[in-house]
Amino acid sequence: SLHDALPIFIEFAEEQKLNSDISFDAEMDRMIIVFDADIFEEKVKDFDEVVAFGENNNILGISNPAFELFLLLHYKDAYEKYIKPNEKEIISNEKVGNQRYIRNLFTQVSGINPKKNKSIGELVKQVDFAIVEECKINEDIHQCSGQVTCNIAKIINDIRNNKAI
């Protein structure tokens, strides 16, 4: 069944809504669940069904192939400089040494290992670049297969503008 195939992070989000320490108001609040689309291509066959289920009571932030794409968007002119010229490589996201292509590209651009360097949090100061740059790629999570996709900056912008549903 679909419920058996639900990724653990959606189940976790649903469980957290019931956590009395959080005081989640189902009428007013939405849980934001952020994940990489590439996990579906490997592990979950029913991507569209999972997205539909997840969107039912949550806001889904999806990056394809991986979260490092969102991080890369925090740099001025990231689309023209880094994403557009490497689009095929980003989507295939093959290993470069011991890292996937997008992580390696991000590390080259930023000088930061996103998994280990705490200074990664400083990128929040550049989120306005991410909002502008993300508009240049696909933001439709329903059409992300085979496309460089991210909608995380859009969610942040919607929250800023009180448009998040």
Residue spans of the language-model regions?
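Short, small-residue-biased leader/transition segments that mark boundaries at the very start
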Residues: 2-6
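Glycine-rich, highly charged phosphate/nucleotide-binding loops
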Residues: 11-19
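C-terminal accessory helical subdomains adjacent to catalytic cores in phosphodiester-
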Residues: 18-32, 37-165
